[in-house]
Amino acid sequence: VIPERIADIVKGIARGCEKANTALIGGETAEHPGLLSEDEFDIAGAATGVVDADKQLGSHRVKAGDVIIAMPASGFHANGYSLVRHILATQKLDLHKQYEGFAKSLGEILLTPTEIYTLDCLALIKAQSENIKTFSHITGGGLADNTARVIPDGLIAKYDRTTWALPGEMKFMAEIAKVPQTDMERTWNCGIGMVAIVDPAIADLTIKSLAARGMKAWIAGSIHAQNGPGAAALEGNYLTR
């Protein structure tokens, strides 16, 4: 164990906890010689929250006509790195190189910290608890799979790709490795890290409230009636930069 490295790791975890207004109540450091090399480390963590049963958000609150408010991702976040590593290896990309169109090296881009949306979501709930239906954190599985988990039977969430542009780093990786769009959208967040499903009456207010907090959000779609289990789909073509 290198003390300075452990200190840097804990500082990073503490910064994340501060951004989520979460207490760091403990932890353990274990050495595994023979399993991890001196330059490797593995980190795991968990957070627990409490909510009154009658204040739970979820699919039971979602209705046809509700609006999908998207919050931008800061990058790949913590998902889809198996595909990223595959592309790095097969395309022989240089992590230290600053590729055309980017202000940082590829390695720096891939290490961009994951955006933490906790306080933004809590602020919306506090201000409009009756009209905030639910949230969906876009992690493994992409936009459609994650959103479908909070959509009840008989409804479908439809995203309009024309409302946002695919992040440059994802476009670059997909194009250079010829990744099909369907595979990309099942693996990466494609630029959206969190969505709030809200009553249409507060859609504009929600966007303004998030903007006041420094979060540039937008209307990315809406909820529609359909026959079948709850689902989500993406339509149209991404904006071009």
Roles of regions detected by a PLM:
Residues 58, 91, 95, 143, ...:
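Membrane-targeting and insertion segments and their boundary/processing signals
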Residues 62-108:
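Acidic, glycine-rich loop-and-beta core segments that form the ion-binding/anion-interacting portion
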Residues 1-82, 222, 235-237:
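Glycine-rich anion-binding loops of enzyme active sites
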Residues 5-20, 36-43, 100-111, 115-241:
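Glycine-/charge-enriched secondary-structure boundary and capping motifs
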